[in-house]
Amino acid sequence: MDLFDKLKELHEQGLAEIKKATDEQTLNKIRVELVGRKGELTKILHSMRDVAPENRREVGQKVNELRDLFNKQLDTTKAKIVKAVLAKKLEDEKIDVTLPGREGHLGSKHPINIILDDLESYFIGMGYKVVQGPEIETDHYCFEMMNLPKDHPARDMQATFYIDGEDLLRTQTSGDQARVLEKHDFSKSPLKMVGPGKVYRRDDDDATHSHQFMQMEGLVVDKNVTMSDLKGTLEMIAKHVFGQDRATRLRPSYFPFTEPSVEMDVSCFNCDGKGCPICKYTGWIEVLGAGMVHPNVLENAGVDSTVYGGFAFGLGLDRFAILKYGIDDIRDFYTNDVRFLKQFRKEEN
């Protein structure tokens, strides 16, 4: 069989094979066999040395024509296959737009974040700035700057997670006060700040205790700040969070960084001050601690305590949420139970 007959036979067989192909994988295999570097047309070109010189040009021309024909048919067939595959996929995956839609499952804010966002907005409206301090704190800022030197017996009041040397997981957000006091320029303005954040204590987790909880520290420092200013501020906080009908009272207490120190109670939510098991028959529930800033705290930060004074308060956001929403177990905040969390969606606004 001469090359002309071989080209004619390859022409017929090649077109037939291309026509039978039903998928891209088969088509690619045919392309390699016909026009690839080691395909049939390439083999014919390699055998041109056996062709008479006067016929070589004609054979080469027919090989090129056949290659162009095969490539054109291969491309056309591939386009048809791709179109057919896409049409089938669209048919299989088509959407019936007349079907009813599925309602999306919306999340909600965590109850502690609801309290936090509400209080931050409240204090910003009263001219306070919000400060974020480090959770990994130094002994210097967490204790010493807050009038708790290394030999102070009040350190035993807080079981601390020490990391190494001077570094620890902060037991209170009071360190934020010291950092801001050091940098604040009192010649320009008074200092009014709140510092929310996570704090850590070496407590055994139970219904009322957690090794990690949220706290918010507040601080006001200026000339002529009095206990009356503190009392009025605390009453406004309590009534804002727990309702205007809540009665409040202050009791003497002790904190190393304030003098005098007080704790604030609100009338019991359950019995309205009459006495019940929840308030231990006192009619009152403790909500936060506060006091006038100790002169040592001011002096440690380089603030003249004979000119400036102020008040500070610290409240537990977890405790506020427990009291406001009537939650029995603090661990409910951290177990990620959607059934528990979604009931606070109505509180977000």
UniProtKB/Swiss-Prot annotation:
It comes from the Bacteria. GO terms for biological process: phenylalanyl-tRNA aminoacylation. Mg(2+) binds at residue 259. SUPFAM superfamilies: Class II aaRS and biotin synthetases, tRNA-binding arm. Its main location: cytoplasm. Binds 2 magnesium ions per tetramer. Keywords: Aminoacyl-tRNA synthetase, ATP-binding, Cytoplasm, Ligase, Magnesium, Metal-binding, Nucleotide-binding, Protein biosynthesis. Belongs to the class-II aminoacyl-tRNA synthetase family. Phe-tRNA synthetase alpha subunit type 1 subfamily. This is Phenylalanine--tRNA ligase alpha subunit. It comes from Lactobacillus helveticus (strain DPC 4571). The lineage of its organism: Bacteria, Bacillati, Bacillota, Bacilli, Lactobacillales. The gene is pheS.
